[in-house]
UniProtKB/Swiss-Prot annotation:
GO terms for biological process: 'de novo' pyrimidine nucleobase biosynthetic process; 'de novo' UMP biosynthetic process. It is a peripheral membrane protein. It comes from the Bacteria. This is Dihydroorotate dehydrogenase (quinone).
């Protein structure tokens, strides 16, 4: 039902401030779930299982991190038929993020710009939300995305990631290490060769210790930026293979404004997502696959607005895909369309 309704309600949502509309939609989706209406508004998507990173995904279309930063809306979002849901980014301590306004629509380009800044309630509240979700309890695949606090010096970033990993590990299907948001000062420095080696070494050691402690191996994925040249992609790919990282998510938002020059809000600071990032993110998927092959599975995300876009990510070397901005513009019908395009 929501597939048909969304084009009708979208103009009202787009008349609101982007962040207000975001919370309004999520709160009402969760309310519908609690009233037992999820079956009426959701997608029923046939199983099309894929095993990636040692995890069985019921279908290859997932929700990217950022839509549900605190893991508070998992059960409502599950109605859309995702094969997996990723929530976060979460940091050790609660933080407000950047001042509002911090999210902007560019409808002429089917794009968003955000400079949220990892606003979240902290990892302890995050874990409590995850533990309370029926989706996880019933076997849904749940990725937990971790980051660093804005006031943590970049030299101490490893400590924040380690702190979060230790707390989310028992509750995750996989854990994503986000080092590519442009909205936390100096964060992308962690994509540099020496910084990345240090971080991945720290987290792989912790992963093995936690696997022994909890008698369960939880895969680690790294989320990278689209604004990388060939040498950077090669260095990151080599590090992923060398450290035996289980997966990589390509990509986060871009700092480029080339595709949206002259549009209202185009010069707002932050990360650009949506249709304009499709080519850059797909280029990174293709180039990264050329480096890592099948040794490190790739989850493709960035600018997916239809089944053909999802298929292009797979053809470039991805094993799974994620959506976010396309969901804002297209609604839940996008999930069904992408799943159908990738079936079989």
């Amino acid at each position: 039902m929501l597939n048909a309704l969304y084009p009708l309600v979208r103009p009202a949502l787009f008349s609101m401030d982007a962040e207000d509309a975001h919370h309004f939609t999520l709160n009402n989706l969760l309310r519908a779930h609690r009233m037992g209406l999820a079956g009426c508004i959701g997608n029923r998507i046939a199983d099309d299982p894929r095993t990636v990173m040692g995890v069985r995904f019921p279908n290859p279309v997932g929700l990217a991190a950022g839509l549900d930063k605190d893991g508070a809306y998992i059960d409502g979002l599950a109605a859309f038929g995702f094969g997996f849901i990723e929530v976060g980014t979460v940091t050790p301590r609660a933080q407000p993020g950047n001042p509002r306004p911090r999210m902007f629509r560019l409808p002429q380009a089917d794009a968003l710009i955000n400079r949220m800044g990892f606003n979240n309630g902290g990892v302890d509240a995050f874990v409590a939300n995850v533990r309370a979700s029926r989706w996880k309890a019933e076997g849904g695949v749940l990725g937990l995305n971790i980051g660093k606090n804005a006031d943590t010096p970049i030299e101490r970033a490893n400590d924040d990631y380690l702190y979060c990993l230790e707390r989310v590990y028992p509750h995750a299907s996989y854990v994503t290490v986000n080092i590519s948001s442009p909205n936390t000062k100096n964060l992308r420095q962690l994509q540099g060769a020496s910084e990345l080696d240090s971080l991945l070494s720290t987290l792989k050691d912790a992963q093995q210790r936690l696997a022994d402690q909890h008698k369960r191996y939880v895969p680690l994925a790294l989320k990278i930026a689209p604004d990388l040249d060939a040498d950077q992609i090669g260095n990151i790919g080599d590090a992923l293979v060398r450290h035996k990282i289980d997966g990589v998510i390509a990509t986060n938002t871009t700092i480029s404004r080339e595709a949206v020059k002259g549009l209202p809000h185009a010069e707002e600071a932050g990360g650009l997502s949506g249709r304009p990032v499709f080519e850059a993110s797909t280029r990174v998927v293709r180039a990264l696959h050329g480096v890592v092959g099948d040794a490190v599975p790739i989850i493709g995300v960035g600018g997916i607005f239809g089944g053909a876009d999802a298929r292009a990510k797979i053809d470039a070397g991805a094993k799974l895909v994620q959506v976010y901005s396309g969901l804002i513009y297209r609604g839940p019908a996008l999930v069904r369309e992408c799943a159908a395009a990738l079936r079989g």
